[in-house]
Structure formats: structure tokens, C-alpha cells
């Protein structure tokens, strides 16, 4: 808690007015002289993306292919300084990325970053580099007038208020997958009833959901988008699918429309499932709240 106590993240004992965005970040960067003296920062580009890909494949839970990484992180909506690579000489020691998104938060529209790919090489995990990287990406976001960030963690931070905690599952036993692709009115994604959800322009919708990196299942104006990747499970690399977006209008998506090996949250179960040990806890940076109903899917 020593790091988070000085950060603008909602605390369990926070007694100020709820539903208020903090516009001023405390000027207390994480004091890591080791990091300052021994590391240098670069940003992801075509020149270092192969090194980045190898680093993630070695150190990150999900095993993305190179084209998917390029599509996710070198997208036309995010700034290059949202993809931070921390080098010790010529070796990547840690990374963090932020994908620029737009959210509806209590019916008001804000830009934010979806923070992901926070990854530290195992040789450096006792140096608290993740705190330094979080400070760096929030500093860069603020320079572009973005102060809200969303992120998942498998850690429940002491005395920090989280949006939601999810069990995770892998589905199995579906040998008759049907990829249903009826017309879907994307504007329905922008009209959800929850307090917090992503919204999209037509350009963003086409970029994120009209490609070979996701499986889109649409039926009778129900919509699920699943990000394709791989994961090491029981010493085997298997293909999995992670929910990126979902709009369930009437629960009439048939179980055979859902792929095998789907990392799926507890609010939408299908087929036979294996409950994983890991949980996902979602947080919001720079926003104080009491309860916050949401329809966001982070990875």
C-alpha cells in the first residue's frame, strides 16, 4: 500500500464526495534511484518490436503473435509514448502499454487509457520497476490531457477500492462452433445502461472488431468480440479467446456460437467450464466512487 497511498486511486476509507474525477495527480513519483541510474526508456516502434515480442512471449501469461501485437499497440488512436520499454543497456527489463479508449462514465464522455502489458523480466522483479512504469505512463497520458486509466490486476491491493472482481473460466467441449455474423448496430454499444463502458466511433468499431485478430459473434443484435491469443496451460500452448466487448440484449446467443477455450468472466457462462485459480480485479485511476456498475472488458 506504500506506493498506492500517495496515488490518485480510490481508497476504501475515502470520505470525500463520490463520483469525482481527480484532476491533480500528487507530485510524488515513485522514488526508485536504481531505475533512474541504470535504465533508459524507449518507445515501441518497428525497430524494436521483434525484441518486444520475444520479451512478452518469454515473460507474459498470454502468448500473442507478432501481427496481433502490432495491431493492438501500434493502432491509429494511441500515442507512441503510451508504449514504454524500459531497457537495461540493450536488454528489455520491463514494459507497459496504454491503449487510448473513450468511456462513458455516469453518462459523461472521457478519454482514457486501457493499461495493459505491464510485464517485468524475472531477473528484475525485486526492483519495483512496475511502480516506475505506472508513473511514467500516467505522466505521458496527462501530457495528452488524459487522466483516467483502467487496468486489470490479479492482485487485490490493500485498502484500494476496485470496480469489480471476476472469476475466470476456460470453456471446453464445443466441437460444433458456429461463427454467427448477423448485422449488428454498433451504436448499441454506446447506449449501455451501466455507469461505465467503452464507446466507439465507426472508425474505432471497424478497427477493433473487423479484422482477423478477433472472433465476432453477432446474432439478433447480441454481440460478443473475442481476442485471439494463446496461453501456456499444463505445459501446452493452447489457443484461447479473451472477451474484448460484449452486448447481450436477450440472452439468445446459443452455446455453439462460443469458441472453445474462452477466457470468460463469471457473468456469461456457457458450455462446460474449468474455473481457473486466477481472478481479475479491475481498477480505475483518478476517479473516486462508491459503487460503479460496469460493462468493460480488459486484458
From Swiss-Prot:
Q: Which reaction does it catalyse?
A: N-terminal glycyl-[protein] + tetradecanoyl-CoA = N-tetradecanoylglycyl-[protein] + CoA + H(+)
Q: Does the keyword Metal-binding apply?
A: no
Q: Which UniProt keywords apply?
A: Acyltransferase, Transferase
| Xref: Pfam families | NMT (PF01233)
Catalytic class of the enzyme: transferase
Q: Which family does it belong to?
A: Belongs to the NMT family.
Task: Provide any one GO MF term from the record.
Answer: glycylpeptide N-tetradecanoyltransferase activity
E.C. number: 2.3.1.97
Protein name per the record: Putative glycylpeptide N-tetradecanoyltransferase
Protein purpose: Adds a myristoyl group to the N-terminal glycine residue of certain proteins.
Amino acid at each position: 500500500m506504500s506506493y498506492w497511498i500517495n496515488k490518485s486511486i480510490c481508497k476504501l476509507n475515502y470520505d470525500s464526495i463520490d463520483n469525482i474525477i481527480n484532476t491533480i495527480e500528487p507530485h510524488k513519483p515513485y522514488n526508485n534511484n536504481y531505475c533512474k541510474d541504470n535504465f533508459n526508456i524507449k518507445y515501441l516502434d518497428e525497430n524494436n518490436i521483434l525484441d518486444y515480442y520475444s520479451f512478452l512471449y518469454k515473460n507474459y501469461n498470454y502468448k500473442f503473435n507478432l501481427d496481433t501485437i502490432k495491431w493492438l499497440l501500434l493502432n491509429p488512436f494511441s500515442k507512441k509514448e503510451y508504449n514504454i520499454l524500459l531497457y537495461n543497456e540493450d536488454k528489455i527489463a520491463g514494459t507497459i502499454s496504454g491503449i487510448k479508449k473513450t468511456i462513458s462514465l455516469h453518462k459523461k464522455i472521457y478519454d482514457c487509457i486501457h493499461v495493459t502489458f505491464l510485464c517485468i523480466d524475472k531477473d528484475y522483479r525485486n526492483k519495483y520497476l512496475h511502480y516506475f512504469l505506472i508513473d511514467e505512463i500516467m505522466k505521458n497520458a496527462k501530457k495528452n490531457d488524459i487522466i483516467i486509466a483502467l487496468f486489470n490486476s490479479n492482485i487485490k491491493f490493500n485498502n484500494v477500492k476496485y470496480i469489480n472482481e471476476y472469476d475466470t473460466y476456460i470453456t471446453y467441449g464445443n466441437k460444433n462452433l458456429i461463427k454467427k455474423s448477423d448485422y449488428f448496430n454498433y451504436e448499441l454499444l454506446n447506449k449501455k445502461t451501466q455507469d461505465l463502458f467503452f464507446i466507439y466511433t465507426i472508425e474505432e468499431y471497424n478497427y477493433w472488431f473487423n479484422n482477423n485478430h478477433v472472433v465476432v459473434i453477432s446474432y439478433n443484435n447480441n454481440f460478443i468480440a473475442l481476442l485471439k491469443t494463446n496461453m501456456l496451460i499444463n505445459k501446452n500452448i493452447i489457443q484461447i479467446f479473451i472477451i474484448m466487448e460484449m452486448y447481450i440484449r436477450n440472452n439468445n446467443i446459443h452455446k455453439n456460437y462460443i469458441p472453445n477455450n474462452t477466457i470468460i468472466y463469471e457473468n456469461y457462462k456457457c458450455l462446460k467450464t474449468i474455473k481457473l485459480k486466477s481472478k481479475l480485479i479491475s481498477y480505475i485511476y483518478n476517479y473516486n466512487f462508491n459503487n460503479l456498475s460496469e460493462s468493460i472488458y480488459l486484458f
